[in-house]
């Protein structure tokens, strides 16, 4: 966070490169850096106190994702938004800050994590590549903060898990890493949020799906998201629960119906 870039000098003999010197561009003095690091360390210690260092990889990754998505505001005007100061000191950031903070916290928890730069929906973006239980996945913490979409549906308490531990194929529906970045192909699904939480359906079973929504409604959850294996199942669920309003058969007393669609990831979210 105390370096904004670098300059370099090439030394050649004839046409042969013999040496290369890099000089960082510092953004603060050493004393300022130490003071800022102390502030960051204090916040990070408070955050990590909420998770057992011996917890399973999935639990650690979800804890970090949940914390950042819930407690750090998305703001394009946030100061220092290209580094972790924006997150741990100011509490507001953009995609680069979310990705850098996710990496910082996960590496503190001994989970390998890298920041990936590229585009999402055609706009410059940053997210993470993580290794959970020996397998690689993608995580986009920025998109976990549902207010990022700015659709004004009262989403302050909602966490969007549609890009928590996804495969390369799922990611590439909306995200594209820069061409100069070499990343592994992510194929594992065990630690995907919907698979891990039993919210993933690959066959149509109205009652089983409806009972998932019912359980969330009856225990007072504000939202419930279910993911389907393909577009056909997703559209079948949308028609059944939303168009035909069969959700009221499972959620007794529900007087209004609000929902979120994600046809890219085949996720149907109902707000209670």
PLM regions and their residue ranges:
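Secondary-structure boundary elements
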Residues: 32-87
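Conserved hydrophobic/aromatic pocket- or pore-lining residues that grip, position, or stack substrates
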Residues: 64, 68, 95, 106
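Secondary-structure capping and boundary motifs in well-ordered enzyme cores
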Residues: 90-94, 98
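Hydrophobic/aromatic-rich core segments of domains that either
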Residues: 97-169
């Amino acid at each position: 966070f105390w370096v904004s870039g670098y300059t370099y000098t090439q030394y050649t003999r004839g046409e042969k490169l013999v040496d290369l010197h890099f000089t960082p561009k510092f953004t603060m003095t050493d004393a300022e850096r130490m003071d800022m690091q102390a502030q960051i360390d204090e916040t990070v210690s408070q955050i990590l106190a909420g998770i057992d260092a011996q917890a399973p990889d999935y639990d650690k990754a979800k804890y970090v994702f949940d914390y950042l998505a819930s407690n750090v505001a998305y703001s394009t005007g946030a100061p220092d938004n290209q580094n972790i100061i924006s997150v741990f000191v100011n509490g507001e950031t953009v995609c680069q800050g979310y990705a850098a903070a996710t990496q910082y916290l996960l590496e503190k928890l001994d989970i390998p994590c890298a920041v990936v730069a590229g585009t999402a929906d055609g706009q410059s973006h940053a997210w993470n590549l993580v290794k959970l239980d020996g397998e690689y996945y993608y995580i986009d913490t920025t998109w976990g903060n549902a207010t990022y979409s700015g659709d004004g549906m009262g989403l302050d308490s909602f966490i969007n898990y549609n890009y928590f531990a996804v495969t390369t194929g799922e990611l590439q529906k909306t995200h594209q890493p820069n061409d100069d970045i070499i990343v592994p192909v992510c194929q594992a699904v065990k630690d995907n949020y919907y698979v891990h939480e039993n919210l993933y359906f690959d066959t149509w079973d109205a009652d089983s799906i409806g009972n998932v929504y019912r359980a969330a409604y009856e225990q007072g959850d504000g939202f419930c998201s279910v993911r389907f294996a393909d577009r056909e199942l997703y559209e079948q669920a949308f028609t059944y629960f939303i168009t035909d309003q069969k959700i009221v058969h499972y959620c007794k007393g529900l007087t209004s119906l609000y929902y979120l669609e994600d046809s890219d990831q085949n996720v149907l979210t109902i707000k209670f």
